[in-house]
Regions:
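Short basic helix-loop element that most often maps to the first helix and adjoining turn
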Residues: 13-32
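DNA major-groove recognition helix of helix-turn-helix/homeodomain DNA-binding modules
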Residues: 53-68
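A detector for short, charged/polar N-terminal pre-domain segments
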Residues: 1-10
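Short amphipathic helical patch at the helix-1/turn junction of helix-turn-helix
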Residues: 9, 20-21, 49
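Recognition helix of helix-turn-helix/homeodomain-like DNA-binding domains
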Residues: 34-48
């Protein structure tokens, strides 16, 4: 798997894990982060590459730090 794909997959797994821990649906997290649910789905599946604004919105909506979202993600 190319390095970029691994990075996106790991980030997506982190988002999904924190979302599950928070008891949020994709719909609710997307609403809280002000992004489209299908975009969030793509992030969680590792097929979308979110920009810094989206990463910050997700972190805020999940009540975690950007560092926590990026844990284990190696560029």
């Amino acid at each position: 798997m190319p390095k970029r794909d691994k990075l996106l997959s790991e980030f997506g797994r982190n988002v999904s894990r924190f979302r599950d821990q928070a008891g949020l649906s994709q719909e609710k997290l997307a609403e809280n982060a002000e992004i489209d649910r299908t975009y969030l789905s793509g992030i969680e599946r590792g097929v979308r590459n979110p920009g810094i604004k989206t990463v910050l919105r997700l972190a805020r909506a999940l009540h975690v730090t950007v560092d926590q979202l990026c844990k284990g993600v190696e560029a």
